[in-house]
A protein has these predicted regions:
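Alpha-helical metal-binding/catalytic segments enriched in His/Glu/Asp
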Residues: 185
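Generic N-terminal targeting/processing segments that precede catalytic cores or assembly contacts
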Residues: 1-182
């Protein structure tokens, strides 16, 4: 699914985030699905920028629709993780986040639609990233964070999902009639 591709890309991006000098990486990403099943999803690329102000890492997975392809098959699904170091909470001002309490802020990048009507279970004006994929991304990131959170800045992780080509493909879906404009959900 698009959500499992976004989750796999989030895992690959996190690996780069925790190890910036990582040049080669395991391209088969073990991703836990909502059912608890673990699947391997190949990751195409990972890149990152690291500065005193922020850490930003992106990973790309090409969606393979398998036996049940849809209009999104073959599209790149890009997950970008951003830590804005200015948002880091000082130890004396806020409790240190744990894997279970870590804050994630979701954003829709290019090719991800914006919700314009109520009734989808998503915030009107927000990105069309459905609840199940959001939770799958959070659960997989929490699994990653579990081993490294003591070494991360105590700041929210911004998760941006982008789908280059998503805006064009969305025109061939029911999304516009459901109130999702500008991309896929």
């Amino acid at each position: 699914t698009t959500g499992s591709c976004a989750a796999a890309a989030a895992i690959a991006a996190f690996r780069k985030l925790k190890n910036p000098i990582l040049e080669d990486f395991n391209r088969n990403i073990h991703t836990v699905l909502p059912s608890g099943e673990t699947i391997e999803i190949p990751c195409q690329s990972v890149s990152g920028t690291f500065s005193d102000e922020k850490i930003e890492v992106s990973a790309t997975v090409i969606k393979d629709g398998g036996d049940d392809p849809d209009v999104t098959s073959g599209l790149p699904i890009v997950t970008t993780l951003t830590l804005n170091l200015a948002e880091a909470k000082q130890a004396n001002n806020a409790p240190v986040q744990t894997p279970e309490t870590w804050e994630f802020v979701f954003h829709g990048g290019p090719g991800v639609g914006t919700v314009t009507l109520p009734g989808l279970g998503l915030e009107v004006g927000g990105p069309a990233i459905n609840a199940t994929p959001r939770q799958m991304i959070i659960d997989n990131l929490r699994n990653c964070i579990r081993y490294y959170y003591r070494y991360l800045p105590n700041a929210p992780i911004h998760v941006t999902i982008s789908v280059p080509g998503g805006e064009e493909v969305a025109a061939r879906t029911f999304n516009p009639r459901l109130g999702v404009v500008g991309g896929i959900s």
